[in-house]
Swiss-Prot record:
This is Natural resistance-associated macrophage protein 1. It comes from Mus musculus (Mouse). Macrophage-specific antiporter that fluxes metal ions in either direction against a proton gradient. Localized to late endosomal lysosomal membranes, delivers bivalent cations from the cytosol into these acidic compartments where they may directly affect antimicrobial activity. Involved in iron metabolism and host natural resistance to infection with intracellular parasites. Its main location: membrane. Changing residue 169 to G: Found in strains resistant to unrelated intracellular parasites, such as Mycobacterium bovis, Salmonella typhimurium and Leishmania donovani; highly glycosylated; locates properly to macrophage late endosome/lysosome membranes; has divalent transition metal transporter activity. The lineage of its organism: Eukaryota, Metazoa, Chordata, Craniata, Vertebrata.
Length: 548
């Protein structure tokens, strides 16, 4: 029988602080060669009034986080949705972005209130075996995301060079450019954030240009955006809608955002400062994801206009009669609906609107791949340091991640063809969706715990909304698996799927169980997991020191 009485509450030096489990005093960590080596001061202003100077000081983490909404996997998902369903799935893109904002809001609040990122909190609360398994799944998500960035960058080099740079060469080039970008943050945190802002601007301008030249029907676009219907849709459209959600909400991005917000100097001994930081980070994230939504909308609308219901024969004839006739051979001469990817997408834009459209598309794709590369590096370092307390330099970290990403990508690029490389991109979108519960469940667990978040714990409405998000994610994953099973090439693969499913469902069930405990389901609590109700045994739970 578990007592409903919580342990005595003691005073503590800062708001939402989390101490580790009893044990030897930790040794001082070496200087961290990460994004967090520099803190941005927050200017003073009258309490209770909105300040543009303060908003500017808080601006940065949200835009870095938003880059995961614009990676090559998202671009491919957008263009395929446009080609398959026209403008009918724009409302799915809108609401998937809103769901993503809700998840990122929780991540930012955890980092601000506790002063720890999600990986660090997982290290404190989960036992060793679930913690290691959880870390491995997030590392898998990061490697999968990095593979998408490698694919997108390699294809952009191939398009920009008119095919002179083979795909496998483009993959190898990504090794060099990644290490080049690692030196950028030596020039200061704000300059690094400004560079990411430049890459987002390049994407907005390039994909915005495609939108202008394609000139999609504004009435049909607005209808697809506001009406949550899909008349005449079947399984292909439904699978594409599921793919949009999986591509938009990425698991490693939740861990990343919870760490990025720690780069601002927030006095966590003052309740009012914590509340203010939460507000400004939410405003910044809303602006950043609004920009990412507009860019994704540009891509989906362009291909909804240019590709929807188009056959391979029609695409072949368009290219054969254009200045890019050498590209016509990539489209088979049949009456099947064209199956588009990020390579074919650039080609058909060039055939329809001139070579400039192709090269501008490739530049936008290159910007998407490069920006995502750096944020993936930071996510990997934060996750490794949080879960394992293992300090690696950025150089070593990116070498590990990029090596894991490049090997399978090079093999596909060398021994298979472009279609298989783009198909790998689609498979990686499915992987990201399957791994999403391993980020959403922990963030929902810890942000719902008063022992961790104090008065900033999720309220009933927030818990209801985020629980619905989790149910939606699980339903999406189940649908993905059921839809994918018939496509397995050999019955022997079913055994591998079953083995994977046992581990996957076991870890998901454990995380769901602890999440229910954190939501107050005391009847589910085991004596070994009382800390999900009351906090860690030696955790100090007092109020705020200072004014509030």
């Amino acid at each position: 029988m578990i007592s409903d009485k919580s342990p005595p509450r003691l005073s503590r030096p800062s708001y939402g602080s989390i101490s580790s489990l009893p044990g030897p005093a930790p040794q001082p960590a070496p200087c961290r060669e990460t994004y967090l080596s520099e803190k941005i001061p927050i200017p003073s202003a009258d309490q209770g009034t909105f300040s543009l100077r303060k908003l500017w000081a808080f601006t940065g983490p949200g835009f870095l986080m938003s880059i995961a909404f614009l990676d090559p996997g998202n671009i491919e998902s957008d263009l395929q949705a446009g080609a398959v369903a026209g403008f009918k799935l724009l409302w799915v893109l809108l609401w998937a972005t809103v769901l993503g904002l809700l998840c990122q809001r929780l991540a930012a609040r955890l980092g601000v209130v506790t002063g720890k990122d999600l990986g660090e909190v997982c290290h404190l609360y989960y036992p060793k075996v679930p913690r290691i398994l959880l870390w491995l799944t997030i590392e898998l998500a990061i490697v999968g995301s990095d593979m998408q960035e490698v694919i997108g960058t390699a294809i952009s080099f191939n398009l920009l060079s008119a095919g002179r740079i083979p795909l496998w060469d483009g993959v190898l080039i990504t090794i060099v450019d990644t290490f080049f970008f690692l030196f950028l943050d030596n020039y200061g945190l704000r300059k690094l954030e400004a560079f990411f802002g430049l890459l987002i601007t390049i994407m907005a301008l390039t994909f915005g240009y495609e939108y202008v030249v394609a000139h999609p029907s504004q009435g049909a676009l607005l209808k697809g955006l506001v009406l949550p219907t899909c008349p005449g849709c079947g399984q292909p459209e439904l699978l594409q809608a599921v793919g949009i959600v999986g591509a938009i909400i990425m698991p490693h991005n939740i861990y990343l955002h919870s760490a990025l917000v720690k780069s601002r100097e927030v006095d966590r001994t003052r309740r009012v400062d914590v509340r203010e930081a939460n507000m400004y980070f939410l405003i910044e994230a809303t602006i950043a994801l609004s920009v990412s939504f507009i860019i994704n909308l540009f891509v989906m609308a362009v291909f909804g206009q240019a590709f929807y219901q188009q056959t391979n024969e029609e695409a072949f004839n368009i290219c054969a009669n254009s200045s890019l006739q050498n590209y016509a051979k990539i489209f088979p001469r049949d009456n099947n609906t064209v199956s588009v990817d990020i390579y074919q997408g650039g080609v058909i834009l060039g055939c329809l609107f001139g070579p400039a459209a192709l090269y501008i598309w490739a530049v936008g794709l290159l910007a998407a791949g490069q920006s995502s590369t750096m944020t993936g590096t930071y996510a990997g370092q934060f996750v490794m340091e949080g879960f394992l307390k293992l300090r690696w330099s950025r150089f070593a970290r990116v070498l590990l991640t990029r090596s894991c990403a490049i090997l399978p990508t090079v093999l596909v690029a060398v021994f298979r063809d472009l279609k298989d490389l783009s198909g790998l991109n689609d498979l990686l979108n499915v992987l990201q969706s399957l791994l999403l519960p391993f980020a959403v469940l922990p963030i929902l667990t810890f942000t719902s715990m008063p022992a961790v978040m104090q008065e900033f714990a999720n309220g009933r409405m927030s818990k209801a909304i985020t629980s619905c998000i989790m149910a939606l994610v699980c339903a999406i994953n189940l649908y993905f698996v059921i839809s994918y099973l018939p496509s397995l090439p050999h019955p022997a693969y079913f055994g591998l799927v079953a083995l994977f499913a046992i581990g996957y469902l076991g870890l998901t069930a454990y995380l769901a169980w602890t999440c229910c405990i954190a939501h107050g389901a005391t009847f589910l609590t085991h004596s070994s997991h009382k800390h999900f109700l009351y906090g860690l045994p030696n955790e100090e739970q007092g109020g705020v020191q200072g004014s509030g």
